[in-house]
């Protein structure tokens, strides 16, 4: 027996930036007052299968809970260029003034050179063991390994304990390693 959990989730965040009631001074009177500065899009798909089962073991105050699972995650980051007027220099560009096409990072549009589309795949598995070894003392151990298509593999472990001193007071502690892959952005 035991319990299975099969899941899949997808999410996307999209930020589009526009300039309204403004101009690119280097284009003078020919500058439109409204233009697209570009957009950033992050998408993620998470899928996995988890399994959990309790095993009665003599000498333990509770069943040993064994949880295991596998996951797949896809991540994508896209940066799309804005209208060329948002980042190009027009015929009235004057390098001796602060005017022109804007200061980089301040209302400057995303250029064709900045445009990108990157993604990665992540595969992982885990195993988690947990039980009350005596009344009011719960202990456990977990291990997880993940492989990133763009960054390599990592394996991390965790040891944890929880002691119920009284119904109002609980002492918890854990020791673990951790890892976070660099952002795609």
Task: State the predicted function of each range.
Residues 119, 123, 146-156, 178:
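Solvent-exposed loop/turn segments connecting transmembrane beta-strands
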Residues 53-55, 131, 137, 145, ...:
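Residue-level signature of outer-membrane beta-barrel architecture
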Residues 125-131, 154-171:
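Feature captures outer-membrane beta-barrel proteins of Gram-negative bacteria and organelles
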Residues 1, 10, 19-138:
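Outer-membrane beta-barrel transmembrane domain signature of Gram-negative proteins
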Residues 3, 135-141, 152-154, 164-166:
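Short, surface-exposed connector motifs at secondary-structure boundaries
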Residues 10-14, 53-55, 70-78, 143-149, ...:
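Transmembrane beta-strands of outer-membrane beta-barrel pores
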Residues 4-8, 64-68, 139-141, 157, ...:
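Transmembrane beta-strands of outer-membrane beta-barrel proteins
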Residues 4, 13-19, 75-81, 91-92, ...:
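Outer-membrane beta-barrel proteins
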């Amino acid at each position: 027996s035991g319990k299975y959990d099969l899941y899949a989730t997808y999410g996307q965040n999209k930020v589009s930036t526009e300039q309204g009631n403004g101009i690119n001074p280097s284009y003078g009177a020919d500058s439109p007052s409204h233009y697209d500065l570009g957009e950033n899009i992050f998408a993620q798909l998470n899928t996995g299968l988890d399994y959990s089962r309790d095993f009665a073991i003599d000498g333990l105050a509770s069943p040993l809970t064994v949880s295991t699972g596998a996951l797949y995650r896809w991540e994508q980051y896209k940066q799309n260029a804005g209208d060329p007027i948002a980042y190009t220099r027009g015929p009235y560009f004057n390098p001796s003034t602060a005017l022109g096409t804007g200061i980089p990072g301040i209302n400057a549009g995303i250029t064709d050179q900045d445009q990108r589309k990157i993604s990665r795949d992540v595969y992982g598995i885990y195993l988690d063991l947990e039980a009350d070894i005596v009344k009011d003392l719960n202990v456990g151990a977990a291990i997880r390994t993940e492989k990133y298509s763009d960054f390599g593999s990592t394996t991390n472990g965790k040891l944890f304990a929880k002691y119920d001193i009284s119904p109002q007071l609980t002492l918890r502690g854990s020791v673990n390693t951790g890892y976070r892959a660099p952002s795609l952005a």
